[in-house]
Amino acid sequence: MLIDAGKLEFLFRMEQDKINRIVLLVLDSVGIGELPDARDYHDEGSNTLSHVIKAVSGLDLPNLEALGIGLIEGVEGLKKIRRPKGSFGRMLEASKGKDTETGHWEMAGLILEKPLPTYPHGFPKEIMESFKKETGLDYLGNKAASGTEIIKELGEEHIKTGKPIVYTSADSVFQIAAHEEIIPIERLYEICRIARKIVDPYHIGRVIARPFIGASGSFKRTERRKDFSLSPTDETVLDRLKSKGQPVVGIGKIGDIFGHRGLTEEIHTKDNMDGVDKTIDALKRSEQGLIFTNLVDFDMLYGHRNDARGYAEALSEVDRRIPEIVELFNDSDMFIITADHGCDPTTPSTDHSREYVPLLVYGNKLKSGIDLGTRKSFADIGQTIAEIFNVGKMPNGKSFLNSIL
């Protein structure tokens, strides 16, 4: 049987253009402007990236600009490169909420119809009674608070009594702070695992261990924070990739966010630069599959603390490292840069903000300069990944693969 010459050429080109490896880099909280429903979340006027740039009277991000970030609708204060090396767009969050899990799960193809619950007035009595019974410990706090402020407020009493500090925020989190000399780190993690089981029926997004050190008046949180997340409520593209034998490497808090599901390797990090280092190491070790990295410092160290200057410096640091990642790419690689929500350090709020997120896509053999527009869901990333690795169509999202091949 003869095959049409045109079809042969098409099949040959498809094989030549095949993508074998994807680096998905999440700049945690780098939002680019309020979503249409931001008012419902009290986030009117938020624009994390543009406001940070304005707050420091301009910012030089040449490598992100070269990929096209300045061309994205809603981004102000960055150069609009006429011929960018990448393609660009922005994404709207279809899920309800603005949590870390919500954003990451949606990237992986899972849309939440109901937001994860929050507790602005503290956790209900039945949760805290179970906490006391199951851990054998009384507690301090049980209110919404800034992590650094509640340690200042209750740290000394915690040292005197040995009671862990329980608090929450505007996000779906059950946070437990303890001095490392009072409650050793492994014991704190054990307490968090117990709390995770207690709050599972309530679908609280994360239990977070928040260890700190130092003396009263100079307490300092350590890098040994650990997240214990609710498992995704349905199948994600990570699950599908793993089941098909593809390497799925989670770097940073990705393993925690996905309840340690759908990953073939988990690599924890100390900070943004360590996250970039670990991403580079993973690129050197494997030539296929997904490398999924979260750089959390933007959110944890600067967004939540309303530190616009620190946020700007962190953006510059990551921008300087992008060439180190790109120079390791071969012709079958794709680079996706995005975010999971906003956390505008220039607004009175210290919490996440409901914002669009950037979408930058680059590859040696991919089209450049394509305006991918406003995507209706973060799940477009998951659908694109599913199409690339031929793991079946996801229930949510629209692939942008045909636009850039």
Predicted feature residues:
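Feature captures the catalytic ectodomains and active-site-proximal regions of enzymes
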Residues: 2-405
